[in-house]
Amino acid sequence: MWYVVDYLYTRAATYLEPRGFNIEHCYLIELGELTPKSPDYIAGHTSQQTHDDIAELLERLRRRPEIEAVSLSQNSYPYNGSNSGAEVSYDTLRSPGWTIRRLVTPDFPRVFRYRGTRGETPEQLAEMLERGEFMASDNLYRKYDRRMTDLVGQRFYLFGDTTKTYRLGAALQNVRYHDYDQARSSYSMMVKQSFYYIGLELCVRVREGQDNDFIERLKADSESQFRIGNIFIS
């Protein structure tokens, strides 16, 4: 009986902890690519053209007045159920082996309203990613009793590569994996356009008051505005 009570209390306490993200007014949109079986398929498209087409699609979405922010990411959006990992090292400090790596475009913090421990806004975090800096959860080195907030501005090794360093732009307010999981160690860095492909997550945040019929309106324009080269949304 006491075990059940303790379990339920722990689950409830975890649920009530800050999530570190906000998904109100956010939508996940699927990217697709025409195959040679389609009569509209454009043969001879290079990988670079595909990267450029996806980038243009993002820009067209950003220009829609009802959309506030648009992002691409890999294994990064809340509740996605998948993750990637890689080591973050500084001097003798090493991140846990299960540290979550989020590859994102700069607007990702704006879509999900990430914030820094020093009060950095989503807009400021986006600018840091644009500069090539990375961001890490404040609990990344908790096994050493070190807060990442105290290491902002320092340079780190990522992916086990000791030939290049990356500047820590901000420590993030801890981001949870889902509602019943405590915040895990994680870091975020910018995904380059040369890595764009249809398997990435396309997420948008619409402006307050614009949710009504948003998906229907977007679908109505998808063929005329959001099929670029062989790339489309669905």
Predicted regions and their residues:
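Short, solvent-exposed loop/turn segments at secondary-structure junctions
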Residues: 34-36, 74-80, 139-142, 162, ...
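Hydrophobic secondary-structure segments that place a key small or acidic residue at a functional site
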Residues: 94-185
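Hydrophobic alpha-helical transmembrane segments of multi-pass inner-membrane transport and secretion
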Residues: 1-11, 234
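Short beta-strand segments
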Residues: 28-31, 71-74, 135-137, 152-158, ...
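Membrane-proximal extracellular/periplasmic loop immediately following the first transmembrane helix
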Residues: 7-96
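Well-ordered, non-membrane alpha-helical segments in soluble/globular domains
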Residues: 47-58, 143, 149-150, 212-216
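Small-residue transmembrane helix packing/gating motifs
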Residues: 50-52, 103, 130-131, 154, ...
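Acidic-histidine catalytic/liganding microenvironments
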Residues: 61-65, 148, 221, 225
